[in-house]
Design a protein with these regions (language model features):
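Low-complexity, Gly/Ser/Thr/Pro-rich intrinsically disordered linker/tail segments
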Residues: 107-158
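Acidic/His-rich structured neighborhood in mature extracellular/periplasmic domains
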Residues: 1-78, 82-92, 96-97, 103-115
Length: 158
């Protein structure tokens, strides 16, 4: 889609890191709250995007991500949404797959990683071993994962 102006993240400091500025050759000075400095020629390659995302991984955390994402209701839950607990430490689990039956009942698969963006892991459901790596929130207010619990009110979307 090439909607580069929609790719932006807020650092924990509050600074808005815009990918559209990055591809114009601006880089981010993280001193204070942050500022843009023209340091490179305009470019939009995979290497540029990866460099931008490395900066995002370094200076964004669960506190800023929780504020940036919008609340999502369980009935509208979709792949790419996340349960997020902002803090230090905080944590995020990402919905990476989902299935829905004729009654509208959903099961979903979760993935997690740790900082700084380490290898991704698929989570086993500790509450219902029969579901394996699948989760269901039917009749529940709390999502229980192997290491973290999340309220259903902590579901967020971009």
């Amino acid at each position: 889609k090439k909607e580069y102006n929609k790719i932006n993240f807020h650092f924990t400091s509050g600074f808005e890191a815009k990918y559209s500025k990055w591809i114009e050759g601006y880089r981010i000075n993280v001193q204070g709250k942050g500022s843009y400095v023209k340091k490179a020629n305009p470019s939009n390659t995979y290497k540029d995007f990866k460099s931008y995302m490395n900066m995002v991984f370094a200076y964004c955390g669960t506190l800023s991500l929780e504020k940036e994402m919008k609340l999502q209701s369980l009935d509208k839950m979709k792949i790419g949404d996340a349960f997020i607990k902002g803090g230090s430490p905080g944590h995020v689990v990402l919905i990476v797959d989902m299935a829905e039956n004729d009654k509208g009942e959903k099961i979903f698969m979760l993935a997690q990683s740790y900082m700084p963006a380490q290898q991704t892991q698929i989570l086993i459901n500790p509450s219902d071993r029969n579901l394996g790596v699948w989760y269901s929130l039917k009749g529940k207010d709390v999502l229980i994962t192997p290491e973290w619990d999340f309220s259903v009110k902590q579901l967020r979307t971009f």
